Every structure is written in C-alpha cells, then in structure tokens.
Amino acid sequence: MEEGGNLGGLIKMVHLLVLSGAWGMQMWVTFVSGFLLFRSLPRHTFGLVQSKLFPFYFHISMGCAFVNLCILASQHAWAQLTFWEASQLYLLFLSLTLATVNARWLEPRTTAAMWALQTVEKERGLGGEVPGSHQGPDPYRQLREKDPKYSALRQNFFRYHGLSSLCNLGCVLSNGLCLAGLALEIRSL
C-alpha cells in the first residue's frame, strides 16, 4: 500500500469481500443447509432451528446489501454512470429491498404461521418424525382433509414461506449477477 494508504483499493476489497461473503452465505443457506437439516431432523426441530437462523440470515443479507450499495453509490458520479454501473446499483438496491422485506415483514409472519401449525400438529401427536421416515398414509394429509383450521393455517404458512423464498432467490440472483459482472471486469488472473 502506498504511504497514506490506498483507500480506493481498500474500498474495492471490502466491496468484493462483503458481496462474495453474502452470496456464499445465501448459496449455502438456500441450496445446502435447509435441505440437509430437513432430511436429518425431526420436523418440529427443523422448524425451531430455522426460526432461530433465518432472522440473523435475513438481517445479515440486508446489512451486506446496504454496505455494498453505499460503497458503490459513493464511488460513482451519478451523471456519468455506465449501463453496467447503473445495473449494479439497481441490483444491489433490489437485493436490499428484498432482504429488508424478508427480514422485517415476511420472516416474522412465516415463523408465527409455523408456530400455529406446530401447535395443532403437537395436539395430534405429529412433528417428532424425520420427513420421509413414515410408512403408510400421510398423517399430515389426513389432518388437512379432516381439519379446515389446520388446512387454512397451512395455506397461510405456505403463502408467507413462498413469498419469502421468492425474495431470497431474488437476492441470490441479484448478488450473483453483481459478482459475475465484477468477474467479467477482471483484466487478468
């Protein structure tokens, strides 16, 4: 580093580390850990673990998007943005928006809906099994068919869970496109 420091180089490193760290975390949580935990833990234990992890995950995603957006926005003259620079700012703003919606609105509602579902399931002796381990008729399907309250709770949970998943995939895609753009700008390895 030059005497007095190379602030531009440091900012670029922070931007790349935060963006790649956020994307790596998102890839792991989205495509690896959830599937492993779902197949390995009893249903209600899995829900408990996810209810503890997701608030941190969404808030960390939100914080990383905010840091990256601030770094990128402060490094460019707004009147002279190239298409790629404007696209990157848009993608980071989209990631920040989706992560914020997930952290502040969808996650608390999804978790509350999950607890309501689990309450009904526990009353019926369900939730202690590992998914895929049950032989015979599906007790959850039978419960849905017999209990309209449970069926409505389940629809509510899957509505919030589906919206949360879409927001999360939007963040993964936005950050992935930003990383791809940065990689394409590298002149040599």
Curated annotation (Swiss-Prot):
Q: Which residues cross the membrane?
A: 18-38, 53-73, 81-101, 166-186
Keyword Repressor appears in the UniProt entry: no
The disulfide bridges present are none
Q: InterPro entries from the entry? A: TMEM205, TMEM205-like
User: Where does this protein reside within or beyond the cell?
Assistant: Membrane
Keywords attached to this entry: Membrane, Transmembrane, Transmembrane helix
Family note: Belongs to the TMEM205 family.
The name under which this protein is listed is: Transmembrane protein 205
Taxonomic path: Eukaryota, Metazoa, Chordata, Craniata, Vertebrata
Name the encoding gene, please.
Answer: TMEM205
